Amino acid sequence: MATITTWFTLGLLGELLGTAVLAYGYTLVPEETRKRYLLLIAIPGIAIVAYALMALGFGSIQSEGHAVYVVRYVDWLLTTPLNVWFLALLAGASREDTVKLVVLQALTIVFGFAGAVTPSPVSYALFAVGGALFGGVIYLLYRNIAVAAKSTLSDIEVSLYRTLRNFVVVLWLVYPVVWLLGAAGVGLMDVETATLVVVYLDVVTKVGFGVIALLAMIDLGSAGETAEEPTAVAGD
């Protein structure tokens, strides 16, 4: 358990550092984007609380002979919808598609948790439902939301949307693999290894997502200012 605590502590430090960087980045992005940028700060900010609790030994229950970290699922229930909400806002998606996207992502986590605390074979059925719901998330991100992005954004902004979308989708696809191989599934991956992998994924997906968006938003802001200068000169 000492090893697991170490991984949680490292995860906490990673989320703290990432939140600090993103909080500073708030002052660097264009004012018109700051409202949605707050979502990027909130994502690792919420994870700080979750990892602090897990590092201190709180937030887990025993189910079917293995530990289930309830706090981790609460973290995901709150943060992963924020990731897809940011993508929908960036793309200028409709309210209907945005709500569908956020709800489907939240339900994916709910069914993943339900599967983790339920004996097999029901656990696998619940896991499959969660997987199907996540398939709906992927469909919306690559279809409806992508169409909205292409119709409303500049080429550079569309590229940012695609980068962030592919980033989270690819990394999020690793989580169900860990679930299946870990204690909740077939048990081929020990708890320490599964914890290490999940901590790494959490820090990369939360902080990495935010940093990629931050750097792109700074560049877009600088490009906008540069484009305005010739106009101002011409007006003079």
Curated annotation (Swiss-Prot):
GO molecular function per UniProt: monoatomic ion channel activity; photoreceptor activity
Topology within the bilayer: Multi-pass membrane protein
Residue stretches spanning the membrane: 4-25, 34-55, 70-91, 95-117, 122-149, 154-182, 191-236
InterPro entries (UniProt xref): Arc/bac/fun_rhodopsins (IPR001425), Rhodopsin_retinal_BS (IPR018229)
GO cellular component: plasma membrane
Function: Photophobic photoreceptor responsible for the negative phototaxis. Activates the sensory rhodopsin II transducer (HTR-II) in response to blue light.
PANTHER family assigned to the protein according to its UniProt record, in alphabetical order: BACTERIORHODOPSIN _OPSIN, NOPA (EUROFUNG), PTHR28286
Protein name as catalogued: Sensory rhodopsin-2
